[in-house]
């Protein structure tokens, strides 16, 4: 779904549009972006008027959410921490509530403080003008 969206020209036509792919896994999302870039090159899309690669469109306008696993956060090195939003997943049964803070601390144990702040709240504050 993400690859198809990135190849659809929607982001080219609406460069101020911001898109959040919620309920997604960062690992799965990274694959979709890599696939979109591969497909773009294989199909010769740059010669058809595409001005940016799908991964560049994603970096400019899109976000993924993450919420539970440390493995996904390793993918931030590929995606860039500026495009990741943390979700508590509340009120779903898979939410770490009422131990949300402890869960976040465990999830972000290997993440540098600046990136942790960015993912946990700064990206959302910027995106939603809070």
Name what the model sees in each region.
Residues 1-57, 71-82:
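Histidine/acidic residue-rich metal-binding segments in metalloenzymes
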Residues 2, 87-89:
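Generic secondary-structure boundary/loop-capping signal
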Residues 8-9, 17, 27-28, 51, ...:
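Mid-to-C-terminal alpha-helical segments outside catalytic/metal-binding sites
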Residues 58-62:
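Surface-exposed cleft-lining segments at the edges of enzyme active sites
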């Amino acid at each position: 779904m993400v690859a198809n969206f990135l190849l659809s020209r929607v982001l080219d036509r609406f460069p101020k549009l911001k898109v959040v792919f919620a309920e997604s896994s960062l690992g799965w999302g990274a694959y979709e972006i890599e696939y979109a870039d591969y497909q773009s090159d294989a199909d010769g899309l740059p010669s058809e008027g595409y001005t940016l690669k799908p991964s560049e469109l994603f970096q400019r306008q899109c976000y993924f959410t993450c919420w539970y696993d440390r493995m996904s956060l390793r993918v931030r090195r590929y995606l860039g921490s500026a495009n990741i939003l943390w979700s508590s997943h509340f009120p779903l049964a898979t939410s770490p509530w009422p131990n949300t803070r402890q869960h976040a601390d465990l999830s972000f144990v290997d993440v540098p403080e600046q990136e942790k702040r960015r993912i946990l709240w700064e990206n959302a504050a910027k995106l939603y003008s809070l």
